[in-house]
């Protein structure tokens, strides 16, 4: 599984470019709907770029963990908002299957909005739903590690890596090399040390002579 680390500067630039496309289309949303969890930060940035103060959140459950999905996307918590006649803009970080956008648009249409459009930072042609606006088309399937989920994603792929040789003691360098070989991603040593410390505190790994050993952890393989 190919992974790519996305910096906050890259996120900022993608949302800024996305906002320019929306303005150029003359669509003027009154309310932005950020899809939780991945769409929260892009939605807030979009509010800033478009000068919109009305922001609501919609929790859509689709991804279980890094690279693993449910069969269908579902709305976790119902909205208690009056959206009748409003121009809505749904914002998410990426669409690769399209299930989150399909579920959210179908749900929000029940609120009788005046209009409803969708925007994502990134769009993969594998998606069953093409958003109205996107900043970047991703032609090769990639798992993007955004600033808001780098701990969640990186701990998951480290556990998967260490589970391939669960009895071994892994050094920090061996983990870095393994991540690069299996997932095409590499953290610098400072960030790797920080990540391993977090995993040790959470009880996912144990520090031992020569490095770290994986503890009993549920591992989902792709």
Which sequence ranges carry the predicted segments?
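PRPP-associated nucleotide enzymes
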Residues: 1-222
């Amino acid at each position: 599984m190919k992974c790519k680390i996305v910096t906050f500067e890259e996120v900022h630039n993608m949302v800024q470019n996305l906002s320019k496309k929306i303005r150029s289309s003359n669509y003027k949303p009154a309310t932005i709907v950020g899809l939780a969890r991945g769409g929260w930060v892009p939605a807030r940035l979009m509010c800033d770029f478009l000068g919109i103060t009305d922001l609501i959140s919609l929790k859509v459950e689709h991804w279980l963990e890094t690279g693993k999905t449910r069969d269908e996307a579902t709305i976790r918590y119902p909205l208690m908002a009056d959206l009748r006649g409003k121009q809505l803009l749904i914002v998410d970080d990426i669409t690769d299957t399209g299930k989150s956008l399909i579920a959210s648009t179908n749900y929000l249409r029940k609120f009788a909005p005046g209009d409803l459009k969708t925007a994502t930072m990134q769009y993969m042609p594998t998606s069953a739903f093409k958003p109205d606006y996107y900043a970047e088309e991703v032609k090769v399937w990639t798992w993007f590690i955004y600033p808001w989920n780098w701990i969640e994603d990186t701990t998951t792929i480290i556990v998967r890596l260490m589970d391939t040789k669960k009895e071994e003691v892994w050094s920090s360098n061996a983990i870095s090399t393994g991540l690069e070989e299996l997932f095409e991603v590499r953290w610098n040593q400072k960030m790797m040390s920080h990540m391993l410390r977090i995993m040790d505190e959470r009880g996912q790994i144990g520090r031992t002579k020569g490095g770290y050993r994986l503890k009993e952890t549920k591992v989902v393989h792709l």
